[in-house]
Amino acid sequence: EYPVDEFIDVLNEEKEKGRIKIFGGSNWTIERFKEGNEWAQKNNKQEMSILNNNLALAKMINPLWNGCLSSNQEEILDYLQTTKKSHMSLSSQARGYFLDDTITKEIEEKITRSESSWRKPGEHSSGPLSCYDSEENRERKKRARKLAENKGCSANNIAASWTLSQSFPSFALIGPRTINELDTTLPCLDIELNQEEINWLNLI
């Protein structure tokens, strides 16, 4: 693992050359992210502005891949709310965990089959059930479905809106493979969640 000061130095050099304006870290622990920005402050360097981890309503129980980190943790959410640093979430819809159960199971089976040629025996796949299914997340899904009924949308829309509705700048990366997947995701942009709903969905 490279020292954080080396990253900050190189990224500041790129900024000074006019190649970038802001920068951040992907799959960094909050401790490492803080360390980098503290070093930047002490050395009159520009800080990292963006943390790029997984931030989904469902908390990861197994990493999508080795080194993948979740920002749905109280310490990280508090830090982002206090500092107003931006967050760009990968797998922001938890790989389809909040879709109808039948569809989620189909996605799980498809991903498991496609990864079987290179996964080690006994190693979990990166499917939605392998990485997100837990008692707490099933309760989050139940609450998302209940709120979706009240707002006239899908639970998946509620989950995506949860990521976008944080009290800090929060952006969601999505990977639709069909026009229909895109069309059924975009309604999340019209949903507004208040802080009480955000906390309730996340079991806070």
Language model features with spans:
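Beta/alpha (TIM)-barrel catalytic core signal, keyed to glycine-rich beta->alpha loops juxtaposed to Asp/Glu
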Residues: 1-203
